[in-house]
Design a protein with these regions (language model features):
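Short, well-ordered alpha-helical segments in soluble proteins
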Residues: 12-13, 26-27, 87
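Short, solvent-exposed amphipathic alpha-helical segments in soluble enzyme
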Residues: 1, 22-25, 132-136
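A short alpha->loop->secondary-structure connector
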Residues: 1-8
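Short, flexible loop/turn elements at secondary-structure junctions
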Residues: 9-12, 100
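Short acidic, glycine/serine/threonine-rich loops at helix termini
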Residues: 1, 17-20, 46-49
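Short, charged, surface-exposed secondary-structure boundary motifs
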Residues: 13-22, 106
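Long, compositionally biased charged/polar accessory segments in the mid-to-C-terminal portions
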Residues: 29-199
Length: 199
């Protein structure tokens, strides 16, 4: 009776091998203690060595090749494409994750992020009530969460880009395979970077 189960909404997990291959070898030699995908509420990909952010490896997520591949779903593990937990039927007392697709709300600073909490059982309701005094919460339509969170409906779908990357990777390696799988995305990323730094 004292056990509560909580599950995360997972959009997919790339292999650690891809992360290592995306980081320059001279940086990998450093004593990396932490990796941040958000820093001070900003969407930046940062590597941290001995509590100091490495200035040579901190960039907006929109300008990072590893994150570009992740957001386009081409570096997920094969098991992510057939995940038994990505469905409407939930297995835990409570489900938590980012609230993508949130519409009108009383929250004034939505850019700091809003969490989604799904209460699936009576035990989940008990757990939520135990925490409610420390939270600001709004009851939302269940469909609002379903519409913008693909893993709440089904596993992430395999794309043509995914097939291109997986076919080329054994022969050309990580970065070259991404260039072939994401030529338009990478070109747009480079143009944006050039324009920003050559005003």
């Amino acid at each position: 009776p004292n056990l509560f189960t909580v599950e995360l909404i997972c959009h997919g997990v790339p292999s650690c091998k891809f992360l290592k291959e995306s980081i320059p070898s001279n940086i990998l030699k450093k004593r990396i203690k932490q990796i941040n995908f958000r820093s001070n509420s900003q969407y930046k990909f940062s590597l941290i060595e001995d509590n100091q952010i490495l200035p040579s490896y901190q960039r907006p997520l929109s300008n990072d090749l590893y994150m570009k591949a992740f957001f386009n779903g081409i570096t997920y593990r094969p098991s992510c494409l057939s995940c038994h937990f990505a469905r409407k039927e939930r297995n835990a007392d409570m489900t938590i994750g980012d609230f993508w697709g949130l519409k009108s709300t009383k929250i004034t600073d939505i850019n700091k992020g809003v969490s989604l909490v799904l209460i699936n059982t009576n035990a989940g309701k008990t757990l939520f009530n135990l925490c409610s005094d420390s939270l600001y919460s709004e009851e939302r339509p269940y469909k609002e969460a379903l519409d913008a969170n693909e893993p709440l409906n089904h596993p992430i779908k395999k794309s043509i880009r995914y097939n291109v990357f997986r076919t080329l990777y054994p022969h050309f390696g990580y970065k070259y395979s991404l260039f072939f799988a994401l030529p338009d995305k990478i070109l747009a990323m480079k143009i944006k970077y050039y324009l920003k730094h050559n005003k």
